């Protein structure tokens, strides 16, 4: 992904003007999977492992969980919706239903995993230990999502749900009931980061931390 970012530079304000999205979604969800680096749907569909994608339903404000192993076009629709960040990406549609990024309604889906029967969980975080999400200014919501009151409420409640879940994750981590992988050094990358050097540094740190955890688990 970093190599593709460096070559194609698919993040920028020009895309916000052209596509109403901070990223070049036409490149990401059309040219990339179809032409530049064709996605191997045959292998993906043949794999029996579960792959769950999360979106936020704009009508209900609730999380929707999808598994798709037959229809390539629907896979792209779901991934596009799951990647559509509020305010910087247009609403996407899955089966005709308006959707946005699943992180709005369920940023940390550990309860969903528990309900699915998974007793051993690995949680991969992109923030340092102790991070808590700030609330979103409700003034920003109506101009963007006037037609979706439940979505507005979900965005308002997001930080409370996120922070409560993070407290649970840290408690379970202290009790040795889940494995958490998170950055150790202070995060220097932004939400929509274009600086290749910063991205590589964060990637290298993640790779190093994962290797250290694997070494400890195999001792």
What are these language model-derived features?
Residues 1-219:
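Patatin-like phospholipase
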């Amino acid at each position: 992904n970093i190599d593709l970012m460096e070559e194609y530079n698919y993040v920028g304000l020009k895309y916000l003007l052209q596509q109403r999205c901070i990223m070049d979604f036409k490149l990401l969800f059309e040219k990339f999977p179809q032409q530049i680096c064709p996605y191997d749907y045959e292998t993906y569909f043949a794999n029996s492992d579960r792959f769950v994608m999360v979106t936020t339903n704009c009508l209900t404000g609730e999380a929707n969980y999808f598994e798709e192993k037959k229809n390539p076009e629907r896979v792209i629709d779901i991934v596009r919706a799951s990647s559509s960040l509020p305010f910087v990406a247009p609403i996407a549609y899955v089966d005709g239903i308006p959707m946005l990024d699943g992180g709005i309604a369920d940023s940390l889906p550990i309860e969903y995993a528990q309900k699915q029967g998974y007793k051993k969980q690995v949680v991969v975080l992109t923030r340092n230990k102790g991070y808590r999400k700030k609330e979103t200014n409700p003034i920003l919501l109506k101009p963007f999502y006037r037609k979706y009151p439940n979505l507005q409420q979900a965005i308002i409640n997001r930080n409370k749900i996120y922070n409560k879940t993070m407290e649970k994750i840290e408690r379970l981590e202290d009790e040795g009931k889940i494995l958490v992988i998170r950055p150790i050094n202070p995060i220097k990358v932004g939400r929509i980061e274009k600086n290749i050097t910063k991205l590589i540094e964060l990637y290298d740190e993640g790779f190093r931390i994962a290797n250290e955890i694997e070494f400890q688990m195999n001792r």
